[in-house]
Structure formats: C-alpha cells, structure tokens
C-alpha cells in the first residue's frame, strides 16, 4: 500500500539487517466497519526514514487554497484552462537564430471523451508529423560536409505489441517512457555564412558576418547548442560539440544562423488523462472548470447534450435489467477525484512506465465499510496492498497514478494491470450507479492507454480481468472476487463487461450516446477531426537543454503563461511530447532524480534523441584535465569533477548511452565518477611485454547467488569498486540479493540488489554485511499449517522492514506454498494464507500429513486485571429449561431459546453484567456468534485446541454415534450407532473436551465427530516414524513412560523446563507421543501435550508503556537513532515507542530474540556449536568448551559464542591467540601462553598486556580454559546481574532509565537479529523467552 550503533553489549555483534520488498500483494478489505470521519495516513510500525516522515506530514496535513494562490498541479497531467490564448513569440530570439520548421500532418484521428456528470467532452488528436530541418553554413576554407541520419518513431494503433519489451535490456530508471521502433528520417546540416535577412511566421534568419567562422559541431543534428568546451574538435564524428551563443567578439562580430529541428511526433491516442467521458454526442461549448478546494477532482470541459446522433445505437450482448436501468436513467459518472499518497512506491509495469495491459475488477469484500474508510485503511497498510482506484455509487477516487503498477492482484497481475476496487453498496440504485461508475472508469482507462476491451474471463487473454481470472490463469493469488458480490445483487461479470464495452464504444464515437436518437443505425462512422484545439500526448525518450531566452515552464500545456525556471542551460530528460493546436511542448525532468519540472515549448529548447543506457565493462584512457559531468551531454552547470593527475589516466566505464549520434560513457577515474563523451577517451593499449600487476590493484570478479544484509555501521554503497568513498544507503536492515563478488587488492566487495526486481544498488564491502549462501528457488505445490501471528515477508530471510503481512485467524491456518528456497541451512517457502502472500521459514510450518503441530506458546500471559469481558475456551450444552438468548448483555428481555435447547455450542466470551454472568454461544460449524445466554442455563466443559491427528480406525460395535460437533447431543447426531458398527473411520483432527478425546473424520461417506473411546486403532497405524526435534517439557504435573501402552509412569517434575530431544513419534488412539532423550540420558515416551517448542514466560512491569517511554524521553542522554549511517539524532516519541513495544516485538520471528533468556543454557550439542565456530581462528572446534561453560554457569551457548567472536575479532586477536608478559611487555617467546577470549581485564590504555596478565593470574593456559573460566565472569558481571535479556539490558523495564547498556534505540533489535541468524545457521531455534508486559 513500507530503519544503528555506537554502543554494544560486549557479548554481541552490533549488526543491522536489511532487504527489499516483493510485490506479491493482495488487495484486502478494511478489517472493521468504517465511518465517514477523517482518517490519518499512518506508516508501518518501523523506524521511519526522514523522507517517509516528510511524506507522512504531506499526506496527513490538510491543504486548503488561499485566495490568490494557485493550487499546485502535477506537470505530468495535461490540464485544460479557460484562457487558451497562445503567447507571442519572443522577439529577442529573432536576433539569435533562425528556425525553419517543415511539417506535414499525415494522419489525424479524433477521439472524444465525455464527462457523464458535467456533460463534457475532450477531443483527442492522433498526429503524425515528419519534419526535416536544414541548417546550412558555407565555409569558404573548408569543403567538409557532415550528414546525420536520425530516426524518429511513428506508432500505429494496430502495430502495438504489448509483449515487445519482454526481452528488452533493463533500462535506466531515469528513462521511464517507452518508445516503439523508429523509422529513419534523414537530416542534413551544413554550415553557411549568409548576410541576407528573412522573417516569416515561425522562421527567422539572422545576419551573419562572412569574415568570422562560427564553431559548429560535426554531429549535432539539433541545430542549436551551447558552447561548453574550449577544445576544438576537427576529426571526431561522434561528439556533440556545443555551439557558441556569444554573438559579440572583441575583435570581430560573430553571428550564427540556425535552423531548429523538432523531432517527429509519435502517433498515439493518449488523451488528456483522465477525464471520465460522458455519453454526449458533440461539443457545444467549452468552459474551464476550476479545481475544487476540497476534493480536487480533475478539470473537465462542460458540454451541451444533443438530441440526435448519426451513430448507430448499441445492441446489448446480454440481457440485464440493471444495465437497462442505467441506460434509462442516463446515469452520469462523477469526476475522478485524485487522492494520491506521496510515499506509495512507484514501479513501472513489466512493459514500462505508462504501459498497463488492462484493468482488474475487485470488490472490497466488506459490507460495512465506506469508500473513505477503505482508502484510509489502505494508506495505513499500503505495504500489504494498495490499488489504483475505488468506486462506489457516488464517487470515483483514484488513489495511485495508473502509469505505475499497484499491489492488488498478486505478483503476476500487479506487473500488468490497473487495479480498481468496488466498494459495497446496499440498495438497487446505489449498486447500479457503482456499476455505471466502474464501467465508465474502466472504459476511460482503456481508451487512454490505447487498449480495446477484451474479456479475459474465459481464456486468460484480454484487457478486462476479474481477480478470479487472475487466480485461475496467472496465479500468485487465490482470490475469487468480484463474482460473489455481483451475484448478491443479481448481477454478473458478463453484464458488467457488456456495460464497459458499450461505454468504450460511446467514448470512441462508434455508437450513439445514451439519451440521443440515432438517425443512422448503420456501422459507426469514423471520428471527425478538428483542427485548432486537438491535443496529442505521446511518450518520448530524449534529452533537452532550455535556451537562455525562453518562455518559461508550464504546469499544464493549457497555461497561457509560463513561470521562470532555474534549469536553463542544463541537460534534462524528456519523457513526453504534447501538441495542442499549433503549440508543441516537451515534459522535462531531472535526468538523475526523475523530478518533474514542467512543460516547455519545443522552440525554447535544444533537443536530442537518446537511446536507453546499457551496461558496459570497459577500460579507457582519458587525459588529465578532462571534465566529468553528472549527466550525459552535460553543461558547465552540471560538472561533476575534473580528471586529476598528469598524462593519461584510467577510466573504468560501467554504463553507456547514445545521445543523437554521440556516445557518452559513465565511469570512474581516480575515485571520481561521471559522464564523459567517448570522443575524449582512447582505448587502453595492452603492453607488448606485460608484467605481473601489483596485488594492490588486481581486480577479480566472480558470479554469486547469495543474499546479504548490510550492517548498521557501513561505509555506504560504491558505484564501482574503484571508488574511494561510498554513498549513503537506505537499504540497511533489509535482505538483498548478491549477484557478484569482487576482489580488488586486499578489498572484497559484493554487488547487492533488490531481491524481487533485480535492480542493482551498488557494491558493498564484504566485511560490512551478513552474508548467506542461497540456492536457486524451486517451484513446489504443497500445503502446510501455520499458526496465527506468524509474519510473512516479501523476501526469504526477510527482516522486520520487509513484512508482507501477518497470518490472521484462530487456530492452524492453511498455507499454500508455490516456491521454496534454501538460505544457508534454513529453508523458506513462498505461498499464500488467507489471501496474503509472502515468505515463511519452514520452521513455522507443519505438514498436514503429519500429526499435530505443537503450540509455540506454553504459558499464556497472565491477566493482571480481570476484564469485564473475558475470553474463554469452553464448550457448552444449553439446558432444556432456559431463560432465553440475548443479542446483547444489555438487553432487558431475552428471546426464546427453545431452538438452542439440548444442543452443544462453543463459548469464546464471558461477561458479567450486574449480578448476572453471560456466555456468548457460537456455532461450532460456521463459527458464527449466536447470542448471549445466562451461565446458569448451560453445562460447560473446557475444550482443548484442535490438532491434526491422522489415523485409521474401526468403530466399535457399541458406540454413541457420529455428531456434527464434539460432545454433541442427540439433536446433533449425524449417524446412529447401529449404522457405524465395525465401519472404517479415517480421522483427520482431534480435540479434548474435558478429559475425553474426540476425533473428527469420515465414516460411511459422512464427516463428523466421534468419541475416541468408541474407536479401535488399526495396528498398522500405531507404528513409529522418525522425527527429530528438541522440545521443552512444560507440564510438571504430568508423567513420562517407558512404554506408552503400559500403566507404569514417572513424574516429569524433576525435568520441568528442561529440553527433551525427540528421535521418533507414534500416534496411539488419537494421542501423539514422542520418544526421545532426557538431559540425564534416559530414553522415554512423553505425550505431545506436555511439550512445547519454546517456553515463554511473562513478567509484569507495573507501569504503562507510555510511562516508560516518558521516562526514557526525559533522560539527560536522549535515546538515539541513526537514520543515516554515522549520523545520530535524538529519537522522537513514536520511534522510542516502536522500539519498546513488547507486543509488536514478540510477534516478529527475529526481533523476539531480544527476549531470549541469556541465563538459561539450551544444551546444544558441541557438534552444532562447532558449525558456528568453523573458520573462527583459535575458537574453531571449541564447541565442547562453550557447551561445558554454558551448563556450568547457566548461560545461553549462542550468546556466549557471539560475545567471544566480538571480543576476539572472530578468534584472530592476539589476546585470543595467546602470549605472555615479561618485564611489563607482551611476548610470545616464553615457554607458556595464556589466552583471553572475552577481553576480561583488557583495558584500553594497554589492552593486550593487561588482558594477558589477567589470563595468567587466572591460569588460562589453553583456549578452552579461557572459555570456561571467562564464562563465569561474564555470567556474574552481566547476565546474573538481573538483566538477563537484551531487552532488559537496553530498556531495563524494572527501573527504566537506569543501568542501560546503550543509547541506540535499535541496539536490542540488531543484536536480536544476530542471535537469530546464528540459530538459523545451525538449524535451531531459541527455547526460553521472557517477555515484559506493560499495563
């Protein structure tokens, strides 16, 4: 629909993770009913970047128009204005240059679109122009003539190929508009001196001095340029040499004559975006409608209706009473309102910016929301999904520019189509109006983008899609809207498509508008063409320089006067061309940033065509003193630097772009980067007797396929590995793809880019990232179960900055996986759950084919204050004699409860109101709340959590029957007992009601619940299967067994909260058993319900989160945040809250590791620990020592290892490698070595000597002794001091503001992620957590 550390705990690596977003987003409805009140735009709960904060403020602050102040309008939108009087030509240009323009209009086609509410129409003209301009200058002393051949494109509607760009090279971001193929046009430019003076309309010839020869480029076809270079170019034919504008010389008068060439226009049918066309026939009057100060809809022309039309009437293809109602009412579509959000991402479609391939019909799936509520919800959750527009019965609101893709239809639909949501309406007329509005908007988009209506519903091909069709034919989503919503109004997609098709034919003047009488029922006539006010807008890919004398920049091409610009004599990108009557314009923007400046008249610029930049890897020589520019064909105002040194210097080129006939290259020389003309470069010649290059500058580049996360402390991204200084990056704390590795001397780099889009960000030093190997993703088709609350990420191994969504619902949810990738030793799967798509670690998934997955939460958070409404987990049978059922506990009287009597229902809420306690009944099949009954009217039991239990059974001859709900009554019996005797029963899930177990499955082709005591398990189903996992024993009152089928049992109390290593599993009568090893070495059987994957404890702080934040905010040394590398600032209230909110942190799979208990060993094997220590100097293969130290002194093994790695520089420090102290000096020449792996006693003023002294006094004569002995100090000094988690160390919730280990608000977050990565590397997870709870 979206961030850092001088301080560190001595035991942690202060690293920061990072990554990018994947557009596998789905459009979802607001979760709660919405009203029409204002909503603020809210960013995700994350550390907001400065730019995001600025964007938020722009959106959340209301804008009002002050009298006398013009509202800003997007320069890319061509807006009509009332005053269409053209400005006069600047006479000063007559004295500077001559422009001859010869143009012929070859084809014109008018398309009219009408605004249905305002009865307004805009005309659209398709122009095709071919212009040839000659500039001639005859030199009496030279006979050289240079000719240029230039290509300009002429696009025809029927030649459009939507797939043309499928295999194109990746284009530079700055070139956002796409061009079709070009036809060659020849231009000849010669230089001449002429003393004749001529003046015609748009043609002026200035006087020239025959004795002075002006400087003219050999290759410049534009006929106008600025003089930026002092060097002469007498031999090159591929450099655009600027031309002098100075007509006055100290010794002689010099005047240059020019004929300006305007490029041929692409012929397109792009209209003035996006007036919703009306159904009127012809334009009668035109008036400018000012922008609204509130809704700010687009400006449209008003038109008068016509009673008759020469066009034929449309014949509907389907019968539709609602469409007939719309036609009869002659419904008009409202204006399109724009409600854009600046922080929404902008990515081009797969064919480029402004190249959608169709439109998708969605509905919001929320009967209680409003259009404003939906938009507000979307803006708060845009990182999950956002769409282009919403429509209801009264309004059309465009929320994102349709030139760029949105996230509403899954990864494959997003890159192709415009996404539009239909907001639910509830009466006949409103629904009809919403269908009319959607059809009108859809037809407008199709017309604007030169697309023809073509339904994709049945064959997966076309321009009009439903979300269901996306799911069926493209995939990446499983939504089926809008069919169910349309059916609820006795309407169908076929009817809606017929209405869209009719609207399109009306807009393109192929059939008669509604409300007119057709006088010619024959085939539609061709649109008539106007002359003076036709507008044509086409995409362009060029560059331009605004002349010193100009008419300024125009916000829209309808403006009568331009505003002054500071972009004169700078090379700008041209992205669009517009022709309005006799006026022609270019839309110009910053070449590098893409910032749009506005429209400029073609006569006010020097224009050149430009091909898309391409990547190169070449080396050239360049002379010292040459100029590097920030853009190709740069001017003196765009100088990047000068080439330093003497003689030839080495220029490493990485990018190349052709401007007209000249070639420019981007690269680096002596640590400075920029663009330079190829004219100034020479190919580096190879020496005849090459010598071995110095190891300091030898470059080796290899392919790579890993992933990386940039550390918080980094030197930035490098454009090339030769750069001496990196650029600041905002890609920290995100997972990026690594495509290449480079070694330059003793420096090593990775080339990192966006995981999903493949966009390269630059080179980063290898020691500034956390790197993991990655295998190629593979396609799969598997189904898993996943718990609610688990995070979906946009990339595998994603960070909290790359969350795609959170699994919703209650109980196990179905996750459909379509892709799998292995990152180091961990496996990640991509799939969809409850309409949300993203990556999940396989650790959080369980296969349905296997028996129940255990709960990850063992100890529920205790309730400090008993709420008036409690959440319970019970099942109840309603008594025959009851006092009735209430819709609300506040109802004074109840309705009859007869139909609920003697039936079983679920209970999930309980509330005490006055002297009565009520429970909320819920249907066990549909989970629908039914109403409140008095607790005295029901018989209740506790009900456990439903778990998977796959098994095959036979029903005993004596049984109680099959029921629709566990513990059901006779009124809920599905099959009688006598029909089930000795029948096969296939179980799929199980649940405990009180102490009785019930199984859910199929028997006699019926599915329902049956008591486990009525079943006999097949002998083949009770066989053990291998299963490897380490659980935590969570029930001190239960037992373990040597044989689960025997009665002998032994108490689990001595093993409470210890780990239990499982090696196999068995399902016995619906109960899951695990067989494994206790810590004392015994091999036993334990029921799955007595085990948990992780042990979570909750500790109440006694204060509110807001109180804790206020204390932190008032500290003398304020909490710090690093929005940019190496730049610290005071964190604001929301940033501190985001970092301290334990509820948010606990739900993040990585950040929750700041609650990992560091004072609790996890009893990991030495073999597992050695995986982390491989290649770590003297610490390698010391896993046994770390394991012994952790057990002996009660410390987490991973924490202990991370501490040692930091202090020893990954086991390579001299302090760790050992030595001795003799006569106050460090030495390695004595017979004894002493080691210190935790930096204990190593004070900064003489760290090595002091550290070795401490080790010598402690007797640490080996690395293992240093590990075990040092662990005691670490435990007593840090962990055992009471702050036994990273969160406690940073925020000290027991006494906020005191004894805190860092000021960086993200210190705990970063170190938590480091712990999580270490666990991932050995294929384990943390087992013991303690989470503070605020009031």
From Swiss-Prot:
EC number of this enzyme: 3.5.1.28, 3.2.1.96
Bias type Low complexity, positions: 515-531
GO cellular component: extracellular region
Post-translational modification remark: Undergoes proteolytic processing to generate the two extracellular lytic enzymes, probably at the septal region on the cell surface.
UniProt keyword Secreted present: yes
Origin: domain of life: Bacteria
Annotated region (Disordered), positions in chain: 51-88, 100-262, 514-535
Any one GO biological process: peptidoglycan catabolic process
Enzyme class: hydrolase
InterPro entries the record matches: Amidase/PGRP_sf, Amidase_domain, GW_dom, GW_dom_sf, MGlyc_endo_b_GlcNAc-like_dom
Comp. bias regions, Polar residues: 58-88, 100-127, 143-155, 176-223, 244-258
Residue ranges of the TM segments: none
SMART domains per the UniProt record, alphabetical: Ami_2, LYZ2
Spans annotated as N-acetylmuramoyl-L-alanine amidase: 303-863
One function term, GO molecular function aspect: N-acetylmuramoyl-L-alanine amidase activity
Leader peptide range in chain numbering: 1-29
Record region (Endo-beta-N-acetylglucosaminidase): 864-1335
Catalyses which reaction(s): Hydrolyzes the link between N-acetylmuramoyl residues and L-amino acid residues in certain cell-wall glycopeptides; an N(4)-(oligosaccharide-(1->3)-[oligosaccharide-(1->6)]-beta-D-Man-(1->4)-beta-D-GlcNAc-(1->4)-alpha-D-GlcNAc)-L-asparaginyl-[protein] + H2O = an oligosaccharide-(1->3)-[oligosaccharide-(1->6)]-beta-D-Man-(1->4)-D-GlcNAc + N(4)-(N-acetyl-beta-D-glucosaminyl)-L-asparaginyl-[protein]
Keyword entries, A-Z: Cell wall biogenesis/degradation, Hydrolase, Multifunctional enzyme, Repeat, Secreted, Signal
Functional summary from the UniProt entry: Endohydrolysis of the di-N-acetylchitobiosyl unit in high-mannose glycopeptides and glycoproteins containing the -[(Man)5(GlcNAc)2]-Asn structure. One N-acetyl-D-glucosamine residue remains attached to the protein; the rest of the oligosaccharide is released intact. Cleaves the peptidoglycan connecting the daughter cells at the end of the cell division cycle, resulting in the separation of the two newly divided cells. Acts as an autolysin in penicillin-induced lysis.
Domain remark in the UniProt entry: The GW domains are responsible for directing the proteins to the septal region.
Subunit details: Oligomer; forms a ring structure at the cell surface which is important for efficient partitioning of daughter cells after cell division.
Protein name: Bifunctional autolysin
